[in-house]
């Protein structure tokens, strides 16, 4: 019985490729940091701009475009202000 288990284990080891744990851990570490171009930190690292890191002029435009609603306005907002 032990001989069969050893033979089966050897057979399974040949079928399943061995994984290198260092490579898989490295790939997971890059997904949300300096190497990820979709995050603000990644954009700063690469020196690029985009949705996560807009240029200064775009930021100022967005702030100016916001509608300031006075406190006396009833909630929900009237259709004209939306």
Swiss-Prot record:
Quick one: where's region Disordered?
Answer: 34-56
Would you tell me the Gene Ontology cellular component terms? Answer: mitochondrion; plastid; ribonucleoprotein complex; ribosome
Q: Which domain of life is it from?
A: Eukaryota
Subcellular localization is given as:
Mitochondrion
Name used for this protein in its record? Small ribosomal subunit protein bTHXm
Cystine bridges: which residues? Answer: none
Say if the entry is tagged with keyword Ribonucleoprotein.
yes
Q: InterPro entries recorded for this chain?
A: Ribosomal_bTHX/bTHXc/bTHXm, Ribosomal_bTHXc/bTHXc_plant
Q: Where is the transit peptide?
A: 1-22
Q: Which family does it belong to?
A: Belongs to the bacterial ribosomal protein bTHX family.
Q: Which organism is it from?
A: Oryza sativa subsp. japonica (Rice)
Alphabetized UniProt keyword annotations? Mitochondrion, Ribonucleoprotein, Ribosomal protein, Transit peptide
Assign the protein's first listed, main location to one coarse class. Answer: mitochondrion
Q: Where is the composition biased (Basic residues)?
A: 37-46
Q: Which Gene Ontology BP terms does the record give?
A: plastid translation
């Amino acid at each position: 019985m032990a001989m069969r288990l050893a033979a089966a284990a050897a057979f399974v080891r040949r079928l399943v490729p061995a994984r290198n744990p260092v490579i898989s851990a490295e790939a997971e570490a890059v997904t949300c940091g300096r190497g990820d171009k979709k995050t603000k930190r990644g954009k700063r690292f690469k020196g690029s701009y985009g949705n996560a890191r807009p240029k200064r002029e775009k930021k100022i435009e967005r702030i100016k475009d916001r509608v300031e609603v006075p406190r006396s306005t009833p909630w929900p907002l009237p259709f004209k202000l939306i």
